[in-house]
């Protein structure tokens, strides 16, 4: 139905531009809607026919009419199910669509109303039938006739509706045939339109091809234009480069020519000045040399003294730093000890509170027991008279029992001695073989640590504390001495700096005084600044030391307080340990939620204690975190001080450099007119200073680069290590969380097992009680088996038989021998038992320090009646083992002497009555857990120690940084120390990682042990199940025996009644025999008296037995009454169920009878149905023929619809293609216009940009060329000066040599002739000497070689300057070579001067 409704029809085509096209589309849509409605009606007709056939078979239900009407309604209004605005065609307006939709909805409402009326009529008819059937004698024939009539009416109405629907469908078929003819005409029209559209598409495709060709041509033109622009730009760039190179060459030539002119002029001036200033310069240099030697010697002596003092003080400071690091390590160890002690004291305080609460509970229980005891003593006094007769019989039994008790006590004492010996052996084996397996070691550590070892540990701790105090005193004294030395050294340094004379006196005399004064002032200011900075640093460090001392003193006081508290708690614990023996240690059980609902219960108090403990642990953690924060703050402050000092040093260096540059500038300005000697000396000194500075800068830069590389590598290495450690720590935390989860699951399973075991134990104890009661009854019934035989026997034999029966009863269950005497007393002491259970419950809640499984209870005796009252051990033993659990955490710390208090002794003596056997399995488990705690705490302590040891190393490193760096190597020393400290930290972190891995392994081992223990507990649970099954079988047997005993008791009561009758008969016989002779009477009387005595004795015995049996019978009667009540309840339930079953059977009979009547009705209805089916088959044949016609019409319709849809889709596609092509054409035209405009704009913009870039490049080139020219001028001037200096020195050396020669060959006649010749020729004397003097050939060759070398050097420098860019290193090497030559020449010059003198 849904497939044929208009909602599933394909969507209408889009609106065309032409009106003819829209009208055709509208008509097609209308026709499509009419066809879909016709198909919907046809489907409805088919379904009505199917419904009719179904209704004939389902006439009993009365719902076929409703189903058929509902489907017909759905067929009438198929459009109503479609969504709003999606089903009407495009030709209709929205208002018309709304009107049609409202009409359809009204039709649906009317159909629904008709259906509702039919449903109500059916309902009323069904209710009327139900009322008739519920009558006492219903007329089934009338009801059946009514139903048949009702169904006939329904079938007639349905037939009418079917005929109406068929008529409607015939009319619609005719309409559809008319629409088919219309559609065929439209298809012909569409085919014609298709041909027209194809022609239009071909024309448009041709146009598209033409446009694409035009577009390609224009794109090629744009590319060609771009390539032309790029080629022009490249040509412009090449032209600009060539012009720049030519400019540079011309400038270099101009500068060279200018430099040559300046050099020539300078040489002339230089030669003239040198001739006049050589003599004066030599004298000044000699004086300066003498003074410089004296000053250097004095400076060296001072320098040696100061260096020795510095070395001594550095060594002392290093020793102090080492002492401080050791003290810090010791302090951190003391802090760890303090933390452990604080945790231990907190645990002990909790224990003391628990013990006090237990004290109060025990006192209350003891008072209650005293009250009960007084009441019981009164009852015992009343029963004393009754039990006096039974005393003789029970005396023998008591003697035997006492002997057995003594034997058992001896056995227990022997076992305890054996246990003590075994423990001693285990301790010895632990000392000799520490490499035992973990399971054996855990089982062997159940004993407590000896007192001697703890006392030795306390003594060693005291000695360590005294040693640390002495070290602190020594360190304080050294610090005070260092302060005084530093102050003396700073004063001496200031005096020395004030007295230092100036070294440099090689400058001219005019600016010397001002320059020397400025240098002295600068040095004084520098010294004052250094002194102030050092004083500030000293004050800061003294403050830090004072703060550290205060902190150490406070921690020391806390330690002492903790030691006192620890001793007091240890003494109290030792008292408990001495009073009680060895006992098991158990963990506090967490209370369940249902136990916390009571306000004043033990569970609530235990939960409060647990939360208090956790709060204390969190407080301890908070304190540790605060300490770590304080340490980090201290490190931050130290880092800040180091950063400030480094910044200060950098600022000082910068100031020195600026001051030196300023001084050089002032000196240049102050001496514009110098002599030739002063200028040469200054140039030499400048060159020397520049060389030294260059070398120092190079060395420092290399060192700094190397150090920076090393530091970067170390930082990267440390970062990788840190990441690795962080990942490891995260993995370990995850593993720990998983282990904790597993342990929690295991504990949860254990708690569940414990609850199950306790329930089983209670069942076992009840079964054992019943068994012991049955056995006691059996033993007492055996005494009453044959009373006639016992009446003839003497009293001694009766007593022996009673003893033997008691012994047999004892041998039935060997393990319960000690408790059978207390059987009757236990029944009377129910109130005392209750008080015991209260006390044991409180002990259970407060003593479970470890969560232990109760598997060990299987080893306890099976038939003990006191097992419920003595399930838990002595209070003193529990307290001892809780102290043992705490003592391993301390690792055998100090234990002191312990005083015994009377209250605790009394309490322990009172509680020792409730002690039972020691349990081994839980003890081993508790020791395992204690060892785990020990290992975990040791590892955490080692981690803390490692971290704390890393912190002093860091402090030491940063203190070493704070030392004033007076040499250039101080920075390298500090970096090396930092590297060493980082390596130490790395090693410590590696150790911590190994410790964590070991702890994880131990946790895994502990988990495996817990799993093994769980398996053991499961095995024990299975064995307990088996024992329970055995006990149930024993119970069944005992119940049978009980029934037999009851029968015997009844027979014994009959025998007692016969004995009473015999005594009554004997009394009249005695009266009758009194008339006889006296002798026979006396004899008979004596015999009768003896018999009576025997009978009375037996009667008293039997009466006492009967009384006990009566008491037991009363108890059994109570039990039987309870069972009778249960049975009566069960019988009532059974009777109620029987009544229900009878009612159900009666109803079943009634229903069967009604079913028979209904079956008869069904047979009649089936006959009618057969006749109707035959009619329906005939109708079906006619309907099938109509269906075939409809199918043929529908197929043709579907074919035409497909053809129509295909043509529509093709037209839509072509329209879309046309629209897309038109849009593309428009886009291409707009794009072409845009491209042309953009190309023109881009070309203009590129031209402007190229102009701007060229202008900027020209400016940059000009500035760069100017800089390069200035640099080349500077280099050439420097080179010329160097070369002129070399020439000058060589010329001076030659003149000196000539002076030597002239002195040797000096004559008055030659001298006069030379003067005359000079005056005649107008030549100076030196020129004349040059003319006259003929030099040696070797010297001439040397001078030529030197000149050639100088020219080659100049050409090499010019090539470097004109060559490619990386030429700085080569230029520097060439200049350094020339400077070295100048140095050598100056040294030769000075040697020649000395020789001339």
Swiss-Prot record:
Q: Which domain of life is it from?
A: Eukaryota
Q: Where is this protein primarily located?
A: cytoplasm
Q: Which GO terms describe its cellular component?
A: centriole; centrosome; cytosol; nucleoplasm; sperm head-tail coupling apparatus
Q: Which residues carry this modification: Phosphoserine?
A: 5, 9, 22, 1219
Intracellular or extracellular location(s):
Cytoplasm, Cytoskeleton, Microtubule organizing center, Centrosome, Centriole
Q: How does it associate, per the subunit comment?
A: Interacts with CEP250 and CEP68. Interacts with NEK2; the interaction leads to phosphorylation of CNTLN.
The protein's name: Centlein
- Gene name, per UniProt, is Cntln
């Amino acid at each position: 139905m849904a497939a044929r409704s208009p909602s599933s029809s394909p969507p209408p085509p889009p609106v065309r531009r032409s009106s003819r096209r829209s009208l055709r589309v509208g008509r097609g849509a209308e026709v499509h809607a009419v066809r879909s409605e016709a198909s919907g009606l046809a489907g409805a007709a088919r379904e009505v026919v199917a419904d009719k056939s179904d209704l004939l078979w389902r006439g009993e239900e009365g719902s076929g009419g409703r189903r058929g009407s509902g489907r017909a309604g759905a067929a009438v209004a198929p459009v109503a199910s479609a969504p709003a605005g999606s089903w009407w065609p495009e030709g209709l307006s929205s208002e018309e669509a709304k009107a049609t939709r409202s009409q359809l909805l009204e039709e649906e409402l009317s159909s629904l109303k008709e259906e509702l009326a039919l449903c109500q009529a059916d309902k009323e008819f069904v209710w009327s039938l139900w009322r008739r059937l519920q009558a006492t004698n219903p007329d089934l024939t009338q009801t059946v006739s009514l139903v048949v009539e009702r169904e006939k009416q329904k079938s007639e109405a349905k037939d009418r509706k079917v005929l109406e629907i068929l008529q409607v469908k015939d009319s619609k078929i005719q309409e559809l045939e008319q629409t088919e003819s219309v559609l065929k005409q439209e298809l012909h029209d569409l085919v014609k339109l298709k041909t027209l559209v194809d022609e239009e598409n071909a024309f448009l495709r041709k146009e598209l091809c033409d446009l694409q060709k035009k577009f390609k041509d224009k794109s090629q033109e744009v590319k060609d234009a771009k390539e032309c622009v790029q080629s022009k730009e490249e040509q412009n760039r090449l032209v600009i480069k060539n012009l720049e190179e030519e400019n540079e060459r011309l400038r270099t030539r101009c500068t060279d020519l200018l430099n040559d002119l300046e050099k020539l002029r300078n040489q002339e001036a230089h030669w003239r000045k040198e001739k006049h200033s050589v003599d004066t310069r030599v004298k000044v240099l000699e004086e300066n040399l003498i003074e410089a030697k004296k000053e250097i010697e004095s400076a060296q002596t001072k320098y040696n003294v100061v260096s020795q003092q510095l070395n001594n003080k550095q060594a002392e400071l290093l020793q102090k730093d080492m002492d401080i690091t050791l003290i810090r390590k010791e302090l951190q160890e003391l802090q760890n000890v303090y933390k452990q002690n604080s945790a231990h004291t907190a645990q002990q305080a909790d224990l003391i509170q628990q013990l006090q609460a237990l004290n109060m509970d025990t006192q209350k229980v003891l008072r209650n027991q005293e009250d009960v005891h007084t009441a019981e003593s009164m009852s015992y006094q009343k029963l004393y008279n009754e039990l006096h007769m039974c005393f003789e019989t029970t005396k023998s039994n008591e003697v035997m029992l006492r002997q057995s008790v003594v034997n058992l006590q001896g056995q227990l004492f022997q076992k305890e001695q054996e246990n003590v010996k075994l423990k001693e052996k285990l301790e010895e084996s632990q000392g000799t073989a520490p490499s035992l397996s973990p399971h054996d070691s855990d089982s062997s550590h159940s004993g407590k640590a000896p007192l001697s070892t703890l006392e030795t540990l306390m003594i060693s701790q005291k000695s360590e504390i005294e040693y640390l105090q002495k070290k602190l005193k020594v360190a304080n004294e050294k610090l005070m001495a260092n302060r005084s030395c530093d102050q003396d050294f700073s004063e001496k340094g200031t005096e020395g700096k004030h007295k230092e004379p100036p070294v440099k006196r090689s400058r001219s005399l005019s600016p010397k005084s001002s320059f020397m004064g400025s240098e002295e002032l600068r040095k004084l200011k520098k010294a004052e600044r250094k002194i102030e900075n050092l004083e500030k640093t000293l004050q800061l460090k003294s403050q830090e030391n004072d703060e550290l001392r205060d902190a150490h003193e406070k921690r020391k006081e806390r330690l002492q307080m903790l030691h006192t508290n620890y001793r007091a708690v240890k003494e109290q614990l030792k008292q408990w340990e001495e009073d009680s023996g060895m006992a098991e240690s158990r963990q506090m059980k967490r209370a369940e939620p249902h136990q916390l609902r009571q306000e004043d219960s033990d569970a609530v108090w235990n939960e409060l204690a647990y939360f208090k403990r956790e709060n204390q642990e969190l407080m301890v953690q908070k304190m540790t975190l605060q300490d770590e924060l304080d340490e980090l703050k201290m490190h931050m402050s130290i880092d800040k001080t180091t950063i400030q000092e480094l910044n200060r040093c950098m600022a000082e260096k910068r100031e020195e450099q600026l001051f030196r540059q300023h001084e050089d500038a002032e000196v240049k300005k102050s001496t514009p007119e110098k002599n030739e000697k002063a200028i040469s000396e200054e140039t030499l000194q400048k060159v020397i200073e520049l060389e030294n500075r260059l070398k120092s800068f190079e060395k420092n830069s290399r060192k700094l680069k190397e150090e920076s590389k090393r530091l970067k590598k170390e930082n990267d290495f440390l970062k990788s290590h840190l990441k690795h450690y962080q990942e490891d720590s995260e993995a370990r935390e995850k593993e720990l969380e998983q282990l904790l989860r597993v342990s929690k699951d295991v504990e949860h399973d254990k708690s569940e097992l414990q609850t199950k075991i306790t329930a089983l134990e209670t069942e076992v104890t009840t079964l054992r009680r019943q068994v012991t009661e049955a056995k006691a009854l059996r033993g007492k019934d055996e005494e009453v088996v044959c009373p006639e035989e016992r009446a003839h026997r003497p009293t001694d034999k009766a007593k022996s038989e009673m003893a033997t029966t008691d012994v047999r009863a004892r041998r039935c269950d060997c393990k319960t021998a000690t408790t059978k005497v207390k059987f009757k007393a236990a029944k009377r002491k129910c109130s005392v038992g209750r008080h015991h259970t209260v006390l044991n419950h409180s002990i259970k809640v407060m003593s479970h320090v470890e969560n232990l499984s109760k598997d060990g209870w299987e080893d306890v005796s099976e038939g003990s009646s006191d097992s419920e009252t003595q399930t838990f051990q002595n209070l003193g033993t529990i307290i001892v083992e809780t102290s043992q659990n705490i003592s391993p955490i301390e690792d055998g710390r100090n234990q002191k002497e312990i005083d015994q208090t009377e209250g605790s002794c009394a309490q322990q003596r009172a509680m020792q009555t409730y002690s039972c056997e020691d349990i081994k399995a839980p003890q081993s488990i508790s020791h395992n857990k204690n060892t785990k705690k020990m290992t975990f705490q040791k590892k955490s302590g080692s981690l803390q120690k490692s971290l704390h040891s890393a912190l002093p190393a860091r402090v030491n490193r940063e203190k070493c940084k704070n030392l004033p760096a007076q040499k250039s190597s101080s920075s390298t020393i500090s970096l090396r120390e930092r590297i060493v400290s980082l390596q130490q930290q790395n090693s410590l972190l590696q150790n911590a990682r190994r410790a964590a891995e070991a702890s994880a392994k131990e946790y895994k081992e502990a988990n495996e042990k817990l799993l093994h223990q769980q398996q053991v507990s499961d095995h024990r649970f299975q064995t307990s199940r088996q024992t329970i099954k055995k006990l149930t079988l024993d119970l069944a047997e005992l119940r049978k025996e009980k029934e037999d005993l009851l029968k015997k008791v009844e027979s014994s009561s009959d025998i007692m009644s016969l004995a009473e009758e015999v005594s009554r008969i004997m009394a009249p016989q005695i009266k009758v025999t009194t008339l006889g002779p006296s002798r026979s009477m006396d004899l008979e009387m004596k015999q009768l008296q003896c018999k009576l005595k025997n009978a009375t004795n037996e009667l008293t015995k039997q009466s006492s037995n009967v009384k006990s049996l009566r008491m037991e019978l009363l108890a059994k009667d109570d039990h039987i009454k309870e069972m009778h009540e249960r049975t009566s309840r069960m019988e009532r339930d059974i009777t109620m169920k029987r009544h229900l079953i009878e009612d159900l059977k009666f109803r079943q009979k009634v229903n069967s009878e009604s079913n028979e009547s209904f079956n008869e009705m069904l047979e009649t209805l089936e006959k009618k149905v057969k006749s109707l089916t035959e009619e329906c088959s005939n109708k079906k044949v006619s309907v099938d023929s109509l269906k075939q016609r409809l199918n043929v019409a529908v197929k043709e319709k579907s074919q035409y619809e497909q053809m129509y849809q295909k043509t529509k889709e093709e037209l839509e596609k072509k329209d879309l293609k046309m629209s897309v092509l038109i849009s593309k054409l428009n886009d291409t035209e707009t794009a072409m216009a845009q491209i042309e405009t953009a190309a023109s704009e881009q070309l203009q913009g590129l031209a402007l940009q190229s102009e701007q870039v060229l202008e900027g490049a020209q400016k940059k080139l000009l500035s760069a060329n100017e800089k390069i020219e200035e640099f080349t001028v500077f280099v050439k001037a420097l080179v010329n000066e160097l070369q002129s200096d070399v020439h000058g020195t060589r010329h001076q050396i030659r003149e000196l040599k000539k002076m030597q020669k002239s002195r040797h060959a000096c004559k008055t006649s030659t001298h006069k002739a030379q003067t005359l010749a000079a005056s005649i020729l107008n030549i100076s004397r030196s020129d004349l000497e040059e003319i006259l003097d003929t030099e040696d050939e070797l010297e001439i060759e040397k001078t030529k070689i030197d000149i050639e070398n100088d020219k080659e050097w100049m050409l090499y420098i010019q090539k470097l300057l004109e060559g490619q860019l990386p030429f700085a290193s080569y230029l520097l090497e060439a200049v350094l070579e020339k400077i070295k030559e100048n140095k050598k020449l100056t040294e030769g010059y000075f040697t020649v001067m000395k020789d001339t003198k």
